[in-house]
Amino acid sequence: MIFRVNLLFSCFCFVLFVFDFSNASKYDQGSLNIAKRLWRDWEREANAKDMERKEVKADAEGNAQMERERRLWRDWEASQAKPLERRAWVEAVEASDQNEREKRLWRDWEGNQANDLERRAMEGLMEANEENQRAKRLWRNWEANHEYEIERKRDLPELKRRKRLWRNEDQEVACTTKCSCSDNEIFSKVDHELTTSETKRVPCCC
């Protein structure tokens, strides 16, 4: 009886053990599945974080590379711009010098033209003054000659009358003058009132 009880208890314990073992196996299997799922989730999250970190690193490296390329490009542009700027500055200075040279030449040419025109104007003025003086002198001479001619023509009858009277007087004086006619001498008298260069020769009447 006791043996049967022990056997039954042993069977019951065995059944409980088997039941517990099966439950434990089931529990362990569920725990394992949960652990595997958690591991997979962790790996997936870790992989995602790693990928994100790699992407961030790649983006940072890409940004750094892009910034480096931009800096190199700006440096290259600056290095290219400096010769261009220097060349433009040199060209601007040369253009300014050329412009100033052209202005100076233009001013010199204008000055020469002005001096030439002024000289010509002065020469023309002097020639005009000389011509004016010559014309005035000729006009005065003509007026003087004309007035002299008018006076001479106006006084010509009187002069002729006076000459005739003077000739008569000279004839009378000559006729009354005592002179020796043996040597055919000629009595001469210079009349300064009539003409200074005129010499009247009156024959001596004896």
From Swiss-Prot:
Disulfide bonds: none annotated. RLWRNWE repeats lie at residues 37-43, 71-77, 104-110, 137-143, 164-170. Contains 3 disulfide bonds. The keyword Kinase does not apply. One of its GO terms (molecular function) is toxin activity. GO terms for cellular component: extracellular region. Expressed by the venom gland. Residues 25-164 form a propeptide. This is U-scoloptoxin(08)-Cw1a. It comes from Cormocephalus westwoodi (Westwood's green centipede).
